[in-house]
Amino acid sequence: MERTQVQIPAAQLDRQRDFEAKLKEMHADRPPRALVDTFGCQQNVADSQYIMGMLRAMGCSFTDDPAQADVVVLNTCAIRDHAEKRVYGNLGALTHTKKANPQQVICLCGCMAQRPEVAEKVRQSYRHVDLVFGPQALWKFPELLYQVYTQRRRVFSVADEHGAIAEGMPVVREGRTRAWVSIMYGCNNFCSYCIVPYVRGRERSRDPERIIDEVRELVADGFREITLLGQNVNSYGKDLGTGYDFADLLTDLDKIEGDYLLRFMSSQPKDATYKLFDVMAASRHVAKQLHLPVQSGCDRVLRAMNRPYDVARYLDLITYARRVMPDLVLTSDVIIGFPGETESEAMETVALVEKVRFDALFTFIFSPRPGTPAAKMEDPVPREEKQRWFDRLCAVQNGISEELHRQYVGQTLRCLVDGESDDARWPLTARTAGGRLVHCTGDRADLGEYRDVKITDSNTWALFGTIE
């Protein structure tokens, strides 16, 4: 495949560093405070780290209080209606902080902002919002913010710039435990329910040398867990035109010396390969964890979703993956109540879940996204009926998860301690190599470290144990 993406020229990126310096000088007498609120997926988390990096280069400090913030950035998600409603609710609340501080600059970015109808709604109904820009304009954030300050006008930048990759942006990563590394952007799959290809553009792969250098630096800086991000990591490299694929990238990353784990998300079954599973099985650093969204256990529904695989293909993939990785932790996504789905078809999905026995399942009732083919499909089944199917699915999966977790009681697992808990009995949280949540004993000295945890109890959602 001919490569369609281009790197943003270094001169244009340097221009953004100049705007950062100008903004820092502009506010030298009183450095501004910024708040970045992130909605949605890990790709948005990674994008917010770049936004924070640029804000810090402008001289900003950070706050969690909107009333104290001079710059507020909402990095939004367009995948589901619930996330959009939360964003609009937050925008409404910001009218009060803007009245109290008229100089406050409010920015809306991310996938919602890329949708023309959202940008127009904000333009007309949320006039206190100063800056709106989509994911493809993230690298121009300093210039856009400079325009807001110097031209004293609202700025909208949602142009279609699907072919651009920006390297070398400043970044702020919290702590030294986990890091997110984008290896590609966009999606070519056009699942009929999904808005992502319309707001994040077509697939563009970063050069492998850039990714390897970034991961090597993170390991040298002491990061313990690095997650490789892409809407479909299994199609990484197709646009490079070299034959170098995701399995090759994992092979090269695994050569980096250090005490760390590599994870990745998300995967598309149509592009998953035996080669990838063989590389995972043989690697020293790649977690034996696979998130492989199935979405439905009914072939007809999969076709309606424009998911180009069938149930037999999916089962073949996971059978092979489990054969070469007996300790594999397998998770998935399922949508219940897709337009036109019948109860018997929904129960095919439940039957698949019973057969596969996923370690965990992320389940959703269909949420129509304006601008997608599925939003125009006839959907005669009432929400109450879909909820009944959904509850049945969740009950089955919860039983499976509880049973699988119970098998770990009495074992000692190596875990990365990554957070603190409000529960005095279990003051720390950790993750196993397979990504299972563990609540455990310990103190702050354990944060960011690998520890052996003796599992003493479990429930549907987590394990519990003591650090040995």
Where are these regions (language model features)?
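Short flexible coil/turn linkers enriched for glycine and charged/polar residues
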Residues: 174-177, 187-189, 286, 296, ...
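Generic beta-strand/beta-sheet core signal
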Residues: 37-39, 196, 229-231, 265-267, ...
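Radical SAM enzyme [4Fe-4S]-AdoMet core and its adjacent flexible, acidic
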Residues: 41, 237-258, 305-308, 368-399
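Terminal RNA-binding accessory module
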Residues: 1, 19, 376-468
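Proteins enriched for Cys/Gly/acidic motifs involved in redox and nucleic-acid/cofactor modification
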Residues: 1-236, 275, 290, 312-323, ...
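Conserved, mostly hydrophobic/aromatic
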Residues: 191, 211, 228, 264, ...
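Conserved SAM/AdoMet-binding glycine-rich loop
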Residues: 106-108, 115-117, 220-348, 354
